[in-house]
Design a protein with these regions (language model features):
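Basic/Trp-rich segment in TM-proximal cytosolic loops or flexible interdomain/linker regions
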Residues: 60, 120-166
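Residue-level signature of catalytic and energy-coupling elements of molecular machines
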Residues: 2, 24, 99
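The conserved acidic donor/metal-binding loop of glycosyltransferases
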Residues: 1-4, 87
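Long helical/loop segments within the catalytic core of UDP-sugar-dependent glycosyltransferases
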Residues: 7-86, 130, 137, 141
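Catalytic donor-sugar/metal-binding loop of nucleotide-sugar-dependent glycosyltransferases
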Residues: 61, 87, 96-115
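Short, hydrophobic alpha-helical packing/hinge segments within bilobed ligand-binding/sensory domains
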Residues: 95-96, 125
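Short, non-transmembrane cytosolic segments of multipass membrane proteins
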Residues: 2-3, 102, 109-134
Length: 166
């Protein structure tokens, strides 16, 4: 485990958790952003993810998306599912989608930051992104129909379901 968290990470995550969210994701940052252009690119991607995806989602009270490992889960969700049920290549996306389909909104805490190490070579980055691409399609093929149906069946979940399909 190469992740590092800020000093107030747990305190900040608990604020969002205490506001009613059973799943809370945080600001993902690169531990080795200054190694080279590849790691710097990951940092820019994470800024985009935080500031232009999860932050606006939180502002309009739709579901955010878990990315990587920096998230909190209420034990009631694990108990309800009889353990961890997400096993696709992108289990973070699968976890987000299954929670949305179960009626849970994922919250976002931009003031809780965690850092993880990113690939440093083009080949490592390529292989990781190919895994992510395959994983995205696994999630789409497994849950796409349910997301589409729920999008129109449950009007309050339209934006969250649409967002995950896109």
């Amino acid at each position: 485990a190469d992740n590092v968290i800020d000093v107030n990470y747990v305190k900040e995550m608990n604020k969002v958790f205490d506001s009613g969210y059973k799943v809370v994701t945080s600001y993902r940052n690169s531990k080795n952003y200054d190694t080279n252009w590849i790691t710097a690119g990951y940092s820019l991607w994470f800024i985009r993810e935080a500031k232009y995806l999860n932050n606006p989602r939180m502002m309009i009270k739709t579901s955010c998306a878990v990315s990587g490992t920096g998230y909190l889960v209420d034990s009631s969700i694990i108990k309800k599912n009889h353990g961890w049920k997400c096993n696709l290549l992108t289990e973070d996306i699968e976890f987000t989608v299954t929670n949305i389909l179960d009626g849970e909104k994922v919250g976002y805490c931009g003031s809780a930051m965690f850092y993880d190490e990113q690939p440093t070579t083009f080949r490592q980055s390529w292989n990781q992104r190919m895994r992510w691409t395959k994983g995205f399609y696994q999630v789409l093929f497994k849950y796409g129909k349910d997301l589409f149906i729920t999008m129109f069946k449950e009007k309050r979940m339209f934006v969250s379901c649409y967002d995950m399909i896109m």
